[in-house]
Amino acid sequence: MVELILNPGKVSLSQLSDVYWHERHARLNLDCRPAIEESCKQVKIAADSEVPVYGVNTGFGKLASIKINPDDSEALQKNLILSHCCGVGESIPNSIVRLMMTLKLVSFGRGASGVCWNIVELLQKMLEKGVMPVIPAQGSVGASGDLAPLAHMTAVMIGEGKSEYNGTIFHGADALTEAGLSPITLGPKEGLAFINGTQFSTAFALAGLFEAWHAAQNSIITSAMSTDA
């Protein structure tokens, strides 16, 4: 199946519908790469600076006034993800997970998140190979981002959490290994960039729209058949 090439700001509902219904895997247009790499560079500069930049070289929330040593940045971002893996309930369908991952790609493609290109590459490879993080259905109200669901998604990328691959549930690191992939190490701000977003809520909204379209189309067909009969 031909992959979708995503151009942030120009992604269509038709493209996202293909992701939902037909399991189309997507990747960013390579034109996005320079902006992504430049934002990654700027974040690294900020992380090494003495000037406090929230979530880059400081703590989060009430700990925003705490300066973080550059050597502790990796642990800070990893702990941010693991501490938010607190979702409950049954896991959401892979069709929704795939939409979430695709929407996160689109967000990163704008070059304003501060993530590095290797993050984008792994997300694209997971979509291509069908590595689907196990994400609990409950745990977000979408207020300051879908923190818990997106943390569960990100956990697999750092070799934690759980993921489905070829119909089997694996530990995150094992799922990546089975697919021939390797986990990433989160750099400054990258954990924050992953969980600050509404891709979980948006994916469900899109799924509702696509299902409604499908139901409407079927109702037209059945009405026509009934009239003809």
Question: At which residue positions do the language-model features occur?
Answer:
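Conserved, well-structured ligand/cofactor-binding cores
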Residues: 1-229
